Structures are given as C-alpha cells and as structure tokens.
Amino acid sequence: MQNKKRLAEKALEQGNGILRLAPTWVPRSFCRPGKRIKLHPDDYFVLGQRGGIDERWFSSTTWAENGPDTPEDEGLSYVVVDDEGKEKVLLRDVVELLGAEVIGETLWNKYHRWPMFSKFFDNAGPLPHHIHHRDQHANRVGASGKPEMYFFPSQLNNHGGEFPFTFFGLNP
C-alpha cells in the first residue's frame, strides 16, 4: 500500500492537482458496438466471446460486473503516473489513500469513496430492458443505487445507429 500511496501522491503533484486517467474500455456480451467511441476498428471485438466493446468509462471506481470471466480491474479507471504509462495506480486506491485531499471534504465525509462515474455508450441498436434501483432498494442487497442520466452529444454521434431512440419508464 505504501508504493500505491507514493504513486498517488506523485500523480497528484505532477498534475498540479489534476489526475491523468487512462481510457477504460468495457465490453458487453448483450450489446453490439456502434463503433463511434474512437476505438480502433480492429479492437471492438478483441475480447471474443466476452462481447464487443461498446462503453468507455470515465473516473470509475466501480467494477464492471460482466460475468465469471470479468477481470478484477474491468471498469476501474487507472491514474497514469509517468509519461510512458508504465507507472499507474487505480483511481479507487488513490481515493482510498488520499481521501479528501483528492475528492474534497464534502464527498469524502458523505461517502468515503468516489461515488460516481460517467460513460459513453455506443450501441448499434437499442439497449435491452433493464432496471437501476434507487438506494432504498439496492441497500437491501448491500449495493448502492444507480441514478442515471443520458446525454447524446451530436459531436460524438455522427449517425444514430439502427434505432436512435431510448425509452424511459416513468413513475408520475
């Protein structure tokens, strides 16, 4: 843990308080990539039966639960320490080790972790039906709720895919 703390402090110092994160690519076996997330065309299906890469996660301290073959660091953002990218440490570890110094007193005192992340979805077709529970329901199984919002910037969507719509279930 001492080496991780040294790397975390070094990254924070080198960036003058800004952490440089490596890209975090996440495959999904139940979706097909729309090929708009600026990944090399040869790399969308590099993980074979685990699925095509159709998500890029940002500032993530959340493990991607993708079944039994999921690597222990899938979905987790790495802080890059050196220019060559050889020295790196998980953002999750940086937050755990440096606490309020890196995420501020308000978030640290309330959550004692980094409680959010962003992602680019890039699906060729519509997402399958799924649900994200609120905290009150997720807490029953020892999990946190997952509030979501969707934004479709035209600069990153040069075409709409096969079905450029999304549906939301609303409880008025």
Report each predicted region and the residues it spans.
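Transition-metal
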Residues: 1-172
